[in-house]
């Protein structure tokens, strides 16, 4: 029986590595109609036809990465699982750099004009999620955007999709982004647009 007083902790890299070693596509990113529709809604929800540099947090095996790569000069796609990153890199996308990184501590260097956080925030505990939000703010160009997308059903993760989305939105609210809800049904998809010149984290 779980002790209700036990602190919530972010899921470790080993959780995901075990998943991908057992099944290279454990969440059916390649075949699920849900994933296909969500990817389309995500790319349709981008406000610009093209971006300079995109960061995708939690890229998994790179299915969404391939779509995002068509909309930018450079994509940095990160995940905590070495097995998932190796599978993603097999696509040999010329403008994509796939990196093994466990966030928030191993945050990529450089700045981005779009940061995509899709089906990833509920794996973090509240403290790590807020630290991730701060790092995203620091790395985002003035006039940049963030896309958040999360399933709203029951989870056995540290947070629900709604909790994770709202906690992250609260953490970035000090920069006063324009918040646009693009979809809410079984998943929530939102875009946050920041003012040009407002690049102080």
PLM feature spans:
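Class I (Rossmann-like) S-adenosyl-L-methionine-dependent methyltransferase catalytic domain
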Residues: 1-57, 61-110, 124-141, 145-201
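A conserved beta-strand element that flanks and buttresses the S-adenosyl-L-methionine
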Residues: 116
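Hydrophobic adenine-recognition pocket in adenosine-nucleotide-binding enzymes
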Residues: 120
């Amino acid at each position: 029986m779980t002790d209700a007083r036990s602190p919530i902790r972010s899921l470790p890299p080993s959780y995901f590595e075990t998943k991908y070693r057992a099944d290279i596509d454990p969440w059916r990113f390649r075949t699920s109609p849900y994933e296909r529709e969500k990817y389309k809604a995500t790319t349709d929800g981008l406000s610009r036809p093209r971006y300079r540099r995109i960061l995708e947090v939690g890229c998994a095996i790179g299915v969404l990465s391939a779509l995002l790569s068509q909309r930018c000069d450079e994509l940095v796609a990160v995940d905590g699982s070495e097995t998932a990153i190796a599978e993603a890199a097999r696509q040999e996308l010329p403008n994509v750099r796939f990196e093994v990184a466990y966030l928030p501590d191993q945050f990529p260097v450089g700045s981005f004009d779009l940061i995509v956080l899709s089906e990833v925030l509920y794996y973090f505990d509240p403290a790590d999620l807020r630290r991730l939000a701060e790092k995203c703010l620091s790395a985002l160009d003035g006039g940049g955007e963030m896309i958040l997308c999360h399933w709203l059903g029951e989870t056995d993760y540290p947070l629900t999709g709604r909790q994770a989305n709202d906690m992250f939105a609260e953490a970035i609210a000090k920069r006063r982004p324009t918040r646009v809800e693009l979809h809410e049904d079984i998943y929530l998809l939102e875009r946050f647009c920041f003012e040009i010149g407002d690049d102080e984290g």
